[in-house]
Amino acid sequence: MSLQENVIRPTANFPPSVWGDQFLTYDEREDQAGLEKVVEDLKDKVRQEILGTLDVPSQHTDLLRLIDSIQRLGIAYHFEEEIDRTLHHFYDAYGDNWTGGATSVWFRIMRQHGFFVSSDVFKSYKDKNGAFKEPLENDIVGFLELYEATYLRVPGEVILDDALVFTKGRLGEISNDPLWRNSIVSTQIIEALEQPVQKRLHRHEALRYITFYQQQASCNESLLKLAKLGFNLLQSLHKKELSQVYKWWKGFDVPTNLPYARNRMVECYFWSLSVFFEPKYSESRMFLAKVFAVETILDDTYDAFGTYEELEIFTAAVHRSSVTCLDALPKNYKLIYRIILSLYEDMEKILTKMGKAHHLNYIRNAMMEYIGCYLKEAKWANDEYTPTMEEHKEVTTVSSGYKFSLIASFAAMGDAITDETFKWALTMPPLAKACCVLCRVMDDIVTHKEEQERKHVASGIQCYMKEFDVTEQHVYDVFNAKVEDAWVEMNEESLKCKDVKRPVIMRVINLARAMDVLYKNKDHYTHVGPELINHIKSLVVDPIMA
């Protein structure tokens, strides 16, 4: 088969990569071994601080704040067992009736770790008339903590719905008050209103919080030093990984061979880093970065290059998943097929080493479902058919690639993943569905106008406008509400999924968090500008200065 001649293709003319080949090489730090010894000593010291006051109720509020700082400084992965032990101790001792201070922090942390504590603790925040009490001038931080706690609410928690509206309004007023305008608290408020803690990427939050934490009188110097050294050491690992995946990508010379496709390997690694940053997930992180790169090529091939007839043949070849299919494909599709096979080979090596080679079948099945839905979209575009919202949702929550991304993210996670994990994810349970809906809707909001400039399947925005005869702005309002509803539903499902291990749940939540960076307000992934460039540089280029 050869590419069809005289075909008018809906090429999108995407912007080129902004990075060049700067990540092709990696220089390892000479002082790394010495720093690792310092980190281990600091970890021992902090570990003793966590466990030293566990049996002293009068110090539980301080212990809670220590755990909060550890989490927000990005070093909780060093102390998973100690934190888990502490929070179980809190739950056994207090249940829903926390008697210490910092109630909002307690509520947020407990729910973040899967403890379904009651929101009734906030009834005391209301006056006798049922209205929320105004923040005291000397406790603006406590008011901000209540705001952050509301983002862990579940459907039907009216008290937290009301608290969000109340705190959001008051915090906006406080941030503009001349008395607070240039203060650290004002900066915290502005950042929280832009993106609450529950939606932040762990590594970005670590950078933010280190800057804030070192200015506090209560700053724990051991904790701060561990956070800074740990960030830089982990950044060295991330740089090395990025170099490895970039070399893999460079070998296919995508800009030359597939000039219609977005060249976004660096952004793909950042995306994967957003899903998991911890050292133990190194192989998972590199594999998922490659998955995102493959998904980008497939997206651009199905949306902005291929004819329906070509895509039918290519889809059938992917379903067969055999090197013997190469001869039947034209040049462009041959390369894409080789990249997919390379992806499978990488995963098979990793899984075989783990004794879980059969898990590759789940990834292949997810890929076939994903690419099959792409073909359905291509047929809609070819037939100039505008689907109903229900039809659109059923197909595009899969063709968007987020379900496949979730399943691929599990692949190299080791003992945390079983056959049941993959079976659970493949059925699109409520937690995964809410995440995929959130991702699809956020994507639609910021990409649909540019997509419709070429021949493209109707977006969710267009489908909704046609079916319900409403304005574009009305659909934006509806879709933005869907995003917030999805977050609330994910909160609930993450608390209810008792048979699903916490690391699995966190992959789902972190994928949603990544969307709040890549697709918030604009398509930062396609049109890489200063904001995303700075995000990426801060994580894989610029170390923290001691």
UniProtKB/Swiss-Prot annotation:
Binding site for Mg(2+) 3: 443, 451
Cofactor: Mg(2+); Mn(2+)
Cofactor remark: Binds 3 Mg(2+) or Mn(2+) ions per subunit.
Tissue: Highly expressed in roots, lower levels in stems and leaves and detected in disk florets, but not in ray florets.
Keyword Transcription regulation: no
Disulfide-bond pairs as recorded: none
Reaction catalysis annotation: (2E,6E)-farnesyl diphosphate = (-)-alpha-isocomene + diphosphate
Alphabetical UniProt keywords: Lyase, Magnesium, Manganese, Metal-binding
Positions annotated to bind Mg(2+) 1: 299, 303
Keyword DNA repair carried by entry: no
Pathway: Secondary metabolite biosynthesis; terpenoid biosynthesis
Broad EC category: lyase
GO terms (BP aspect): diterpenoid biosynthetic process
Protein EC: 4.2.3.136
Pfam annotation, one family: Terpene_synth
InterPro entries cross-referenced by the UniProt entry: Isoprenoid_synthase_dom_sf, Terpene_cyclase-like_1_C, Terpene_cyclase_plant_C1, Terpene_synth_N, Terpene_synth_N_sf, Terpene_synthase-like, Terpene_synthase_metal-bd, Terpenoid_cyclase/PrenylTrfase
Residue sites binding Mg(2+) 2 per the record: 299, 303
DDXXD motif, short sequence motif: residues: 299-303
Domain notes: The Asp-Asp-Xaa-Xaa-Asp/Glu (DDXXD/E) motif is important for the catalytic activity, presumably through binding to Mg(2+).
Assigned protein family: Belongs to the terpene synthase family. Tpsa subfamily.
Function: Sesquiterpene synthase involved in the biosynthesis of alpha-isocomene as the major product and detectable amounts of beta-caryophyllene, beta-isocomene, silphinene and modeph-2-ene. Produces exclusively the (-)-(E)-beta caryophyllene enantiomer.
Protein name, entry field: Alpha-isocomene synthase
Protein source organism: Matricaria chamomilla var. recutita (German chamomile)
